[in-house]
Structures are given as C-alpha cells and as structure tokens.
A protein has these predicted regions:
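Active-site recognition of the HExxH zinc-binding catalytic motif
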Residues: 44, 60-68, 72-73, 133
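Alpha-helical linker/edge segments of TPR/alpha-solenoid repeat scaffolds
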Residues: 179-183, 284-291, 318-322, 350-360, ...
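Canonical tetratricopeptide repeat
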Residues: 241, 275, 309-310, 343, ...
Length: 414
C-alpha cells in the first residue's frame, strides 16, 4: 500500500489532476484491475502487480487512470464532487473491502449494488474518453520520468494473451484494447525520448511478494527459485522469492539464511527487514522483531509498513496501550484508512474502553460501506455515554453525519 501511495502521488504531481487529496484502497484479488473514481479514490487489485511486468508498465496503468480522473470521465454530471468524496468511496469500494474483511452478506450486497452503478458509469465511456486518457497518461508518464513506451507494450501483451478469452480481466472489459488503440499509443510514445525509467529493484521485490502471496504451492516455488539461483546466484529478486517461499512453507531457518545473504548487501533495506520481522514473529522471537522495527523506525520514522509491524508486535505482547499510541499518530495522517480504525477498535477493546471501541468500529464500518452497522455502533456508544453530555453530543453529531452520507449513497444508486 505504501508503494502504491508514493508512486501514484509521484504521477499525480505531473498530472492534470487538480485536487491531489487521494484515498487509496488495495483489493485482495489476483485479477487485473485498477481504477480512479470521483473524490480521488484510487483502487488497485493485487493482480495489477502480477500482470504489469515492470514498474513503467504499472505506472502506465495508473497514469491512464489518473487521466480519467483529471478529465472527470467518471464524474461529469456529478455535482459537488468534493462533498461526495467519502460517500462515493464507500459506495464504490466499501462492499469489496467489507467482503474481503469478512463482513459477509452486507459486503456482498454492497458489491452487487456498487458494481451495477459502476457498470452503468463505465458504459458511458466512449472511444474518445479512452483515447484522451491514453494521450494524457503517456504525457504524464514522460513527465514523471518513466518510459512512455511501456503503455503500448503492456496493452499489446494483454491483447495477445486474452484475444480469444471469453472471460478477460475486468480491466479489459472496461478498457477494451484494439489494434488501432495500440498503434495510436505506440505512435504517441515514440514521439518522446526513450530514456525514461523502465523498472526498479523495489518494484520487482514488491511484485515478487505479491506473487508469493497468491502462490498456492510455496514448496514448488522454492524449488523453482533454487534452480534460477543455481544458474545465477546474484539475482536478488529470486533470492527474496526463495526466502518468502521458505517462510510460507515453514522452512524458517532456511528462510533466515536466504534473507541474511540479502541483508549483507543492504542491511537497512526495509523490504528485506520486514521479511525478517515476519520470520521472527513466526518463530515467536518477538523481542528480536521489535528491536529490529524500532531500529529501522529511527531511520524511517514515517514508514507505514514498519509502524504497522510495530502495532502488531505490541498487540502480540499484550501491550495495547502502547499500540494505541502508535495508532493515534498514524490516524492523524491517514484518517480514512479502515485498517487503522479496525486496529484502534481492537486496542480500545483490550483496554476496556468500550465507548471508544464502538466509536472506532463505527468509523471502520462507515469506511467499508456498512452504514447500518456504523450507526448501530454509535447507538451503543451513546447509551454508554449517557452520563456525559458533551461526549454523547459529539457521538450523536457523528451519527447524524453517517445518516446523511448513507442517504446520499442511496440516492446516488437509484
């Protein structure tokens, strides 16, 4: 998630997007898809990293989506875009997140309604919209320092791969690829110098992590990586993949050996260290894991994955009050992150702060689109706060805001 945020903000700086207050949601799906919606909502499937073979290809997809956003291809005809940010976020993405988080029927119902609304909106895309997004996206890629040829290259590969497929990825249904579109993007890309960034080690490491996340046979993957390393032992990405495969298959000491070889080269590389932290946690070496996290946080105090790792470790050691302090700092910079609100609810529950627990749950449920649950949680909070007029009034005001947002969503989906 941190990589997506930083990379999209980098693209946004050179894009035509005027309001760069963006909200990000990563969707746990191996299917290829990414989209940008009104209110600055950026959605990315894990599958994008599986299909985009280089960082420039990944950036080409995101630049294309930012172009849709900047030209308001989704939002034309929608009034008061700024006021609609949170409701639109919940309507378009909430059901998917809720289902992924185990919210069951509520999540699935939201998915059905939001997919229908999204499909209606996407059917309005014209060939002109896609050409405009391609043109602006290529310009943005070049300005951001990437090789714009990555866009036609990825389109061409996807067209060859899914030319005769009856069930192509959702991205290709909403963004159909044709010979003429590929030719047009290639002609535009060729107008720029070919000296932009194609790829990076960081992207390949993250891509490897996503691949191993969806890998169903880590033992077979480890065998494959060993074969690659036998031929070329200097391939750090393959060694990282081997370490993750070993970790996933329970070969903890072998994974440690693989990671140590990588850390000898770059001891402060966050990606490698996060894998060691995961390894130490799996081996119940929580003190070692926490010492590593705290050492790295001195170097990278604002690193989101490191802060999340610290919270997880503190909770595993029943140090909920310390975990909540870390989360309180995180939520100041990420107020619309449902993952953080979920963890805040957990820490408040462990601290027996029941009113705070219900308030945090309400924020979480609202962000994942389940307003009924959010409103219900605030009902429970108000009952507990009945003897505190000021607190009860604040809770009631928040509840009324949720009721209004829910009404706006229902009106939008009619």
């Amino acid at each position: 998630k941190s990589f997506v945020e930083h990379s999209v903000y980098k693209l946004a700086e050179t894009s035509q997007v005027q309001d760069r207050r963006l909200e990000f949601v990563l969707i746990d799906s191996a299917q290829l898809n990414a989209f940008a919606a009104p209110g600055g909502i950026i959605g990315v499937n894990g599958g994008l990293f599986l299909y985009a073979q280089t960082e420039a290809e990944y950036a080409s997809v995101m630049a294309h989506e930012l172009a849709h956003l900047s030209q308001r291809h989704f939002a034309r005809g929608v009034e008061a875009q700024q006021r609609m940010q949170l409701p639109m976020m919940a309507a378009l993405l909430g059901g998917i997140i809720a289902a992924a988080a185990g919210a069951g029927d509520a999540g699935m119902a939201a998915i059905v309604s939001t997919q229908a609304a999204a499909m209606q909106e996407r059917q309005r895309f014209s060939r002109q919209n896609e050409q405009e997004a391609d043109r602006i996206g290529i310009l943005n890629l070049e300005k951001a320092g990437y090789d714009p040829r990555a866009m036609p290259s990825m389109f061409e590969r996807l067209m060859r791969q899914y030319r005769y497929d009856r069930k192509p990825p959702e991205f290709l249904l909403s963004h159909p690829v044709s010979e003429s579109r590929i030719a047009d993007t290639r002609n535009r890309a060729e107008q720029y110098p070919g000296n932009g960034v194609q790829d990076s080690l960081r992207y390949q490491l993250l891509r490897m992590r996503v691949q191993l996340f969806y890998e169903e046979s880590p033992g077979m993957a480890a065998k494959r990586f060993r074969g690659i390393l036998d031929e070329n032992p200097k391939l750090d990405v393959a060694r990282y993949g081997l370490a993750l495969a070993q970790l996933k298959s329970g070969q903890l000491e072998q994974a440690r050996e693989s990671l140590q070889l990588l850390l000898q080269k770059t001891p402060n590389e966050v990606i490698y260290n996060l894998a060691v932290i995961e390894l130490d946690t799996a081996a119940n070496r929580l003190k070692d894991a926490q010492e590593r996290v705290q050492r790295l946080l001195k170097l990278y105090p604002n690193d989101y994955p490191l802060n999340q790792s610290l919270v997880d470790l503190l909770l595993k050691q029943n140090r909920s009050s310390e975990a909540e302090k870390v989360l309180d700092q995180l939520i100041k910079t990420r107020p619309n992150d449902p993952d953080i609100w979920y963890q805040i609810a957990e820490t408040r529950g462990l601290a027996n702060n029941i009113i705070g627990l219900h308030q945090a749950r309400a924020e979480y449920f609202a962000l994942v689109g389940d307003y009924d649950q959010a409103i219900q949680q605030l009902d429970l909070a108000k009952r507990r706060a009945s003897n505190n007029f000021q607190l009860a009034s604040r809770i009631d005001a928040r509840q009324q805001a949720f009721i209004q947002e829910q009404a706006m969503i229902k009106q939008m989906l009619r």
